[in-house]
From Swiss-Prot:
Organism, as annotated: Elaphe quadrivirgata
Alphabetical UniProt keywords: Disulfide bond, Glycoprotein, Phospholipase A2 inhibitor, Secreted, Signal
Changes after translation: N-glycosylated.
Function as written in the Swiss-Prot or TrEMBL entry: Inhibits the enzymatic activity of phospholipase A2 (PA2).
Entry annotated with the keyword ATP-binding: no
Primary location: secreted
Location within or outside the cell: Secreted
Name of the protein in its database record: Phospholipase A2 inhibitor gamma subunit B
Signal peptide limits: 1-19
A GO term for molecular function: phospholipase A2 inhibitor activity
Sugar attachment sites: N31
Tissue: Expressed by the liver. Not expressed in esophagus, stomach, pancreas, spleen, gall bladder, small intestine, rectum, kidney, trachea, lung, testis and body fat.
SS bond partners: C22-C46, C25-C32, C39-C67, C73-C94, C95-C100, C120-C145, C138-C165, C171-C191
Subunit structure: Heterodimer of subunit A and subunit B.
C-alpha cells in the first residue's frame, strides 16, 4: 500500500497572480471528475496528468487534475526508473477556463523499453531516508540520476527515499518546486548527469 502511495505522490506533478478555479481529483483509470478548488496565488493554470506504473507483466494507470503553473506546461512528459523491472512515467496537459471542459485528457503512448547506454544508482526506501543501491540501466529519455529524500513527513506519510534514472523534464519540474502537496514535509531533490554503462 505504501508503494502505491509513493507512486501516486511521484506522479502528482502539481504543476502568476490571478486566482483561478481548477478541478481536483485522483482516480485509478483514465476518467477523472472531482470538485472545484481555488488555486494559490502563484498557480495560473489547471493541469491534468496521466501516470503509469509499469512492472511487467502488470501496469497501473491513474489520472489526476489539479492546479499548476504555466511555466511548467512545456514539461509535458516525464519518466523515471528506480529498478530494472519498474518504470514510472507521466503525461501532462495544461488548460484554463472553458478549455478544460473540452481538452482531451493526456494519453501515454505504448511503452517501448530501449536502453540508452546510461546508468544510475537505483533503489526505493518506503520507510527510510536510506536504501540499498544497485546499478540501473537508463531507458529512452532518461539521462539524469535522480535522488529524492522525504524527511519530516506529516501524519499521512512516512519517510521515503528514491534513487534512479530520470528524464531531464522531471528534474526541471522538481526545480520549479511543484510539490504543493508536500508543503508540510522536507523534500531534498538532486539531479546529476547519468554516466555511461561500463562493459562487464
Amino acid at each position: 500500500m505504501k508503494f502505491l502511495l509513493f507512486c501516486c505522490l511521484f506522479g502528482t506533478f502539481l504543476a502568476t497572480g490571478m486566482c483561478i478555479d481548477c478541478e481536483h481529483c485522483v482516480v485509478w483509470g483514465q476518467n477523472c471528475t472531482g470538485w472545484k478548488e481555488t488555486c494559490g496565488e502563484n498557480e495560473d493554470t489547471c493541469v491534468t496528468y496521466q501516470t503509469e506504473v509499469i512492472r511487467p507483466p502488470l501496469s497501473i494507470t491513474f489520472t489526476a487534475k489539479t492546479c499548476g503553473t504555466s511555466d511548467t506546461c512545456h514539461l509535458d512528459y516525464v519518466e523515471a526508473n528506480p529498478h530494472t523491472e519498474l518504470t514510472l512515467r507521466a503525461k501532462r496537459a495544461c488548460c484554463t477556463g472553458d478549455e478544460c471542459q473540452t481538452l482531451p485528457p493526456p494519453v501515454l503512448e505504448p511503452q517501448v523499453n530501449r536502453p540508452n547506454g546510461l546508468q544510475c544508482p537505483g533503489c526505493i526506501g518506503l520507510t527510510s531516508t536510506e536504501c540499498n543501491e544497485y546499478l540501473v540501466s537508463c531507458q529512452g529519455s532518461e539521462n539524469q540520476c535522480l535522488t529524492i529524500i522525504l524527511k519530516k513527513p506529516d501524519f499521512s506519510l512516512s519517510e521515503m527515499s528514491f534513487k534512479g534514472c530520470a528524464s531531464e523534464n522531471l528534474c526541471l519540474l522538481f526545480e520549479k518546486k511543484f510539490w504543493r502537496f508536500l508543503e508540510a514535509s522536507e523534500v531534498d531533490v538532486k539531479c546529476t548527469p547519468a554516466v555511461p554503462q561500463t562493459s562487464q
